[in-house]
Amino acid sequence: MPRPGTSGRRPLLLVLLLPLFAAATSAASPSPSPSQVVEVPGVPSRPASVAVCRCCPGQTSRRSRCIRAFCRVRSCQPKKCAGPQRCLNPVPAVPSPSPSVRKRQVSLNWQPLTLQEARALLKRRRPRGPGGRGLLRRRPPQRAPAGKAPVLCPLICHNGGVCVKPDRCLCPPDFAGKFCQLHSSGARPPAPAVPGLTRSVYTMPLANHRDDEHGVASMVSVHVEHPQEASVVVHQVERVSGPWEEADAEAVARAEAAARAEAAAPYTVLAQSAPREDGYSDASGFGYCFRELRGGECASPLPGLRTQEVCCRGAGLAWGVHDCQLCSERLGNSERVSAPDGPCPTGFERVNGSCEDVDECATGGRCQHGECANTRGGYTCVCPDGFLLDSSRSSCISQHVISEAKGPCFRVLRDGGCSLPILRNITKQICCCSRVGKAWGRGCQLCPPFGSEGFREICPAGPGYHYSASDLRYNTRPLGQEPPRVSLSQPRTLPATSRPSAGFLPTHRLEPRPEPRPDPRPGPELPLPSIPAWTGPEIPESGPSSGMCQRNPQVCGPGRCISRPSGYTCACDSGFRLSPQGTRCIDVDECRRVPPPCAPGRCENSPGSFRCVCGPGFRAGPRAAECLDVDECHRVPPPCDLGRCENTPGSFLCVCPAGYQAAPHGASCQDVDECTQSPGLCGRGACKNLPGSFRCVCPAGFRGSACEEDVDECAQEPPPCGPGRCDNTAGSFHCACPAGFRSRGPGAPCQDVDECARSPPPCTYGRCENTEGSFQCVCPMGFQPNTAGSECEDVDECENHLACPGQECVNSPGSFQCRTCPSGHHLHRGRCTDVDECSSGAPPCGPHGHCTNTEGSFRCSCAPGYRAPSGRPGPCADVNECLEGDFCFPHGECLNTDGSFACTCAPGYRPGPRGASCLDVDECSEEDLCQSGICTNTDGSFECICPPGHRAGPDLASCLDVDECRERGPALCGSQRCENSPGSYRCVRDCDPGYHAGPEGTCDDVDECQEYGPEICGAQRCENTPGSYRCTPACDPGYQPTPGGGCQDVDECRNRSFCGAHAVCQNLPGSFQCLCDQGYEGARDGRHCVDVNECETLQGVCGAALCENVEGSFLCVCPNSPEEFDPMTGRCVPPRTSAGTFPGSQPQAPASPVLPARPPPPPLPRRPSTPRQGPVGSGRRECYFDTAAPDACDNILARNVTWQECCCTVGEGWGSGCRIQQCPGTETAEYQSLCPHGRGYLAPSGDLSLRRDVDECQLFRDQVCKSGVCVNTAPGYSCYCSNGYYYHTQRLECIDNDECADEEPACEGGRCVNTVGSYHCTCEPPLVLDGSQRRCVSNESQSLDDNLGVCWQEVGADLVCSHPRLDRQATYTECCCLYGEAWGMDCALCPAQDSDDFEALCNVLRPPAYSPPRPGGFGLPYEYGPDLGPPYQGLPYGPELYPPPALPYDPYPPPPGPFARREAPYGAPRFDMPDFEDDGGPYGESEAPAPPGPGTRWPYRSRDTRRSFPEPEEPPEGGSYAGSLAEPYEELEAEECGILDGCTNGRCVRVPEGFTCRCFDGYRLDMTRMACVDINECDEAEAASPLCVNARCLNTDGSFRCICRPGFAPTHQPHHCAPARPRA
């Protein structure tokens, strides 16, 4: 018995068990009552039938009530308060002394708890602080709502539940679960154990284990009894406190002593292992790494799993899974090294005879972008946020490197856009690091240039290398997350040095009990997890044909195909289950289990597994299948400084004492500044804040506790103002002082003013004497006081005229002096005044000057050309410039004038602009001189330079022509006539009429039609003839006139090489046509044919093989040389041993298993035929195919073919007029005689020694490969179909592949709608499509409309709403898409389910409008449009039966656009559109699908079509395609979309989270305004790769344009200007 007053601690474990098979558990074993007690061996407990109150941590039990323990602030350590004013003394760690004690501490006998019990046990009471205590809940930051925002309830609560929070339903009694979808039975009294149960033992670590407090091993075992058909998942085991948690301190001491005595016992780990579906195999090589050894046990395991070498070279002391192994002596520290001279382990060096650890971090250069942390024998890299360890664990790389986002990779940038994508979507890292792609993604993101910082960020390993997520999965795993799996179906053999290990998950072993009794009560059908020992399902009643596993080993997908006598079955891998049809392994969606895993986090399903995404305040549990609350109160240092920390789910609370409040960051308590919160707290005083309180400091003149009382200083004695008047003021007083007195401010008395101390002082020139209230001035001789008596002023003695007789009197301060007047002055009234010489008598400066009087003299200002005498004032005289300057020289003479001068220039010269020089006259520019010659100016004259045949005239001012014929006489030209010409002459002959003399002396024909114009012949056409002309009828182009006056066609094809080597010229009336050979197309000039690059025009024609263009055709080259490309299946297969390459031929099975090719459809019943010796008659007739079809008469391959050409190729019958003679079988002697060389060869002229390959593509034209591309081979042919089609070997055409009919689900969780060449997926609300557009996922985070209203389920013929939904209100979208036909009190009608509005509102697809199929075929140019017929009823096949499982990229998706115009039958949609995807609809504008035939399914409710399906329209000229994309969404109201401005420059689309704006190209989304704003491409362009080369970038609305710089001109390359070439 424990002693009174002492307390101890023993562990109590709480296990939360969530049975996956709830009904079976409740049926087989009774649920325990809420008062059930967990029995711990060795601990006293009450009987199970007695109700027991268990108090929460921090509370004590008193009289069947739980009382909260209260401790003073700072009186107890954190979590050490045991009761009122009582602290819990710390207890040292208690190691286990013996196996019996160890078992008593960790072993539990347990029964499952009900959901109510689990909630009651985990619920914690949240205390509220009394009085002034502040209470803060720490939450993740959220956007503050504007005004009063109602609570959005996106959950649809079932069974009468009410949505009270965005993530919570308030469920009625007997129901539970997030959506109230689970039926939970009420509390039942305990019942005796039912025989036939199975006991499972789970061994796992404690979730909240702390070594410093608990002092026991962190591994515990839990025993659970459950039915054999139930599977139990233990999410976590926690330690909780209870009223019986008191022990004797002496018992603790004894246990501690016993533990020390047993220290030599072997170390063991309390864990048992058994196979389980989601665990690790023993071959994984990972185990627990233990940091401490306590009492014979390994304790304190590190989070996660490690290999033994990594553990022992680091901080571990022991390692193991089932048994604990001490680290090797050579892997420990320096004390463990025994051999003094032996080599040290890696990471150690010998110092003074011992091995010491090497600090690798001190050398530098390690852990790029991270922090290096030294460990024993090595080092580790700690990466900052946003970075991860790479596979070498020696550097940190950006998280963007392993982004799994995939998109198209473009190889060509052309005309400002992206083109030529590769065939599959890949990650940006693979695209750009391989340097194959130039841009990536739907927005055409340019790959960074090689060597740039952006390139090094996404390609840290350099060009040609990339990181995959699997390389970093071990390094980037969060603590507690599930490690990588090792499939149980593929066991591996451990090396000799490794040890078996188990995953960091609870393992269990099964203990069989007697068989349970059958329970007749039915239960819900829930999926059971697959068991590794399970051998396979039962053989289905009807399955595919036998031999499927040999023909198609991967028919089961993620599983193993097992042949059965009547078919096959599948053994599925872990995480997959057999499909309902029993023919495929499909993924098990663990997230849909009941109850779902990952609570309270979010579960994300993945193929074969799942993962948990935990919210803030939670962390992944040890099993990575749950989210555990983070106890922030256990942090070091603990939060809530100056207060008490209380943990809450996902956060924590700070309870602060009075005068304190929680800090803004919520991690501590801070003092409340009362002075700041209440500014007027102290009135006129100063508030001083104190820890937990405050006080007021009053200024002078105030008093009181809040400084509210004023002090009256005027009532004091003696009066404070002296001779002045005192006026009391608030907080002080004011003195009104008389003249001569002043106060120094409020509260200062009146004092005498010393005027003599002023600056400047009064009484200038005198002495100042201060008096009481005034002053006086004492002045010296010569001064007297002024009238105010404040200054001494000078006495002016010069006012007496007799002071200086005959002289001038000059007064000075205090005196005066007499002086005689200077020159230029005279005495006037006792003063000397100036004499004005300019106004007295004649002008002193003469007629050419201006007189200016000065003091005592004057000054003369002379006109130009005149100057005054120097040294004295006088009249202005003329200046002779000709004597003083070198004017008019050397071509003139200077002449002086009065006030100036003039130049007399020589002939040929004239005065300059200023008249001071003589300049040459340029006669050549002023007169028309030297006609027919060149005028050259000379100094003072000019001269004429005459051309040959000219001479100067008599006046030497012109050039005259020399008449050679007159001067040199008739002998100059002999017998011809001499004709003079300007500058020369010519000898001409006398020509006949209609001819004229040519330049070489010959007679040339005169073209009258050109010389006289078309008027010469009127309405006819003028045709020149030698010496004359004639008028002929006018013929059109391509025709020529006949001798009879008519027009006839010109045969351009007479020249056989007119159309080139790859075409045949066909003459047409008035024209011609070049018919190109296969693989060629007409050039722009129409005169020749050029090669067609099928690798660019036929996207995806080679599948995964490499497409190589050749002249007139193309090749599909397989990456592995032994393989060859099979065009019928689109795959590379081993080479066939047989010589035939005809479609449908069966090659021999290859040695290694490969992906099987598409087998031909099952043979249809053929018409009976009788043996025959040969056809009746010979010659050329019709060749038929598919003769067993009902319309066999229409199945004509070709006409005018021989019996051999038909039957030795692909024909099945030969004849005429539907009188068909069947071709002989290939194994018959008749066939061997007809076709001695086999199919595809003929014996020319009956010579069996020769053979000729038959070109089926040329012989049968487009009938042998309808809607495809036919390529001839030797022998046979290949038919290449576009993506989404396969070649039908009987119908000889490419037909649409119905992906929806394939065994592999095309749309997981949704409805599949097949389209021509592709398919689309649609989901029923509230499910939405994920990023792959092929899978429907839960939309838990979708934000619905705020406006709730009544939903009307029926609308009558008179538009009257009726039958409202009474259980709940709904939004407009919810009502129209799920429940009713009208919404709101105004009875707003919902859109019709076959309308565009309904499609856009509810995110569903509807059947297209039907129209006749457009006949297709590949002519010149190629067209898209396969003929649609009845669907094939056989086994469905797609382009690839199953995609390769290990490829790091996704197959190229089908064209997602609704109106994507297909200009070629293969490849992706056009990339000159703004976006790859748009949500307008599922069909293209080139053709519409045919009406559904037999077997075609439309998963829609039938209603009358109120509106036809809209046909797309071409955007108007000058408009953008983005505008047409937004048209289907323009009718969405702002209230529906939740966006106020309606997504300007974008369109409103529905996304899993609700609605958002999808911006057009050139715009980005501004999240603050939810509007699309223009992207300034010019500002965001990188300097290393400018947008405009040799040009200036100018931003425009939604785009940009380039303006070439001066000296540059635009080129054909977009946004690129080249130096302009100078014009010739």
Curated annotation (Swiss-Prot):
Chain intervals for the UniProt region annotation (Disordered): 125-146, 474-546, 1130-1179, 1446-1524
GO biological process terms, semicolon-separated: elastic fiber assembly; hormone secretion; protein folding; regulation of cell growth; regulation of transforming growth factor beta receptor signaling pathway; transforming growth factor beta receptor signaling pathway
UniProt feature, compositional bias: Pro residues: 1156-1168, 1446-1458
InterPro entries on file: ECM_structural_protein, EGF-like_Ca-bd_dom, EGF-like_CS, EGF-like_dom, EGF-type_Asp/Asn_hydroxyl_site, EGF_Ca-bd_CS, Growth_fac_rcpt_cys_sf, NOTCH1_EGF-like
Description of post-translational modifications: Contains hydroxylated asparagine residues.
Main location: secreted
Gene3D superfamilies: Laminin, TGF-beta binding (TB) domain
Subunit structure: Forms part of the large latent transforming growth factor beta precursor complex; removal is essential for activation of complex. Interacts with LTBP1 and TGFB1. Interacts with EFEMP2; this interaction promotes fibrillar deposition of EFEMP2.
The organism's taxonomic lineage, starting at the top: Eukaryota, Metazoa, Chordata, Craniata, Vertebrata
Biased amino acid composition, Polar residues: 487-500, 1138-1149
Residue ranges of domain TB in the record: 287-339, 407-459, 1181-1235, 1349-1402
Top-level taxonomic group: Eukaryota
Localization, UniProt: Secreted, Extracellular space, Extracellular matrix
Protein name as catalogued: Latent-transforming growth factor beta-binding protein 4
Main function: Key regulator of transforming growth factor beta (TGFB1, TGFB2 and TGFB3) that controls TGF-beta activation by maintaining it in a latent state during storage in extracellular space. Associates specifically via disulfide bonds with the Latency-associated peptide (LAP), which is the regulatory chain of TGF-beta, and regulates integrin-dependent activation of TGF-beta.
Glycosylated residue positions: 352, 425, 1055, 1200, 1339
